[in-house]
A protein has these predicted regions:
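Concave beta-strand-loop units of leucine-rich repeat
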Residues: 3-18, 25-40, 46-62, 68-84, ...
Length: 270
């Protein structure tokens, strides 16, 4: 379909013998869905506007350039287990969900995106050893659960430039991670849910000052299991706090809890 330049919606699936999808003239599209497990060449280089959600599933592509596409607040879902490099523009105007199936990648890179105007979610990159995200600001929610199984990759999960999360932060199961680091993060405007289950080191939010906003009702839940969640500069929590600690087992005891500079919790503490 080399002459197609616009489509109200486009769905490609159950095409078992197709290895190439070429849409070199497509500049705008509504809902866009591709599910094709033999496609190793995918060309949407002219696409400028996505006016609906886009889902790419089971493609064999290894790189994807999104730097020219305006997602107009819509959601891009990527379920491609060989996709190891994504390049975006400075501002990503939409939601980005990275949800590969049966992924065995050991390396993954996301480049170029500094400002995420929607949600960012990433799950089930079991074997990736370094997961370093470039964001400075994320306007929506962040959800990270790279390892929900028993794979021992010793992953390093870092957001070295991130300063503010406009929504909620959820750090779920990142089992056997060596490091989870948000060194510049100052504010989480939504709720915060963090678990340290089976981590190899503490999680430290070294510059985090506040969780929630005065206008909202948020919840901070810290599930501390064998390793700590350190917030040395945290002063204000606009909402309730629920701290859960692991019981003593196999010679280990529940951890110490210390948030020395907290001045205000507007909700319940439990």
């Amino acid at each position: 379909m080399t002459e197609l330049y616009s489509a109200g919606g486009l769905t490609i699936k159950n095409c078992k013998e197709i290895s190439t999808i070429e849409l070199p003239g497509l500049t705008s599209c509504g809902e866009f869905s591709v599910d094709a497990n033999k496609v190793n060449k995918f060309n949407i280089s002219a696409l400028r506007d996505a006016f609906g959600n886009m889902t790419l599933s089971n493609l064999l592509i290894e790189e994807l350039d999104l730097s020219r596409i305006n997602f107009n607040g819509n959601t891009l879902t990527l379920q491609c287990n060989r996709l190891n490099k994504i390049v975006g523009s400075e501002t990503f105007n939409g939601n980005l969900l990275l949800l590969p199936k049966n992924c065995r990648l050991t390396e993954f890179t996301l480049e170029g995106i500094l400002n995420m105007q929607g949600n960012f979610e990433c799950k089930d990159y079991f074997y990736v050893k370094r997961f370093i995200m470039p964001f400075v600001n994320v306007a929506g929610d962040i959800t990270i659960a790279l390892n929900t199984g028993s794979v021992d990759t010793g992953a390093e999960i870092e957001f070295p430039k991130l300063q503010e999360i406009g929504g909620a932060l959820t750090l779920g199961k990142n089992i056997n991670a060596n490091k989870i680091d948000f060194p510049l993060l100052k504010r989480i405007l939504g709720s915060c849910s963090v678990t340290t289950s089976s981590l190899k080191d503490d999680i430290e939010f070294s510059n985090l000052e506040s969780i929630g906003t005065e206008a909202g009702s948020t919840q901070a839940e810290f599930n501390i299991n064998k390793t700590n969640i350190l917030c040395p500069k945290l002063k204000t929590i606009h909402g309730g706090v629920n701290i859960i600690t692991d019981v003593a087992m196999f010679g280990m005891t529940a951890n110490n809890i210390s948030y020395p500079n907290v001045e205000s919790i507007s909700g319940d503490l439990s």
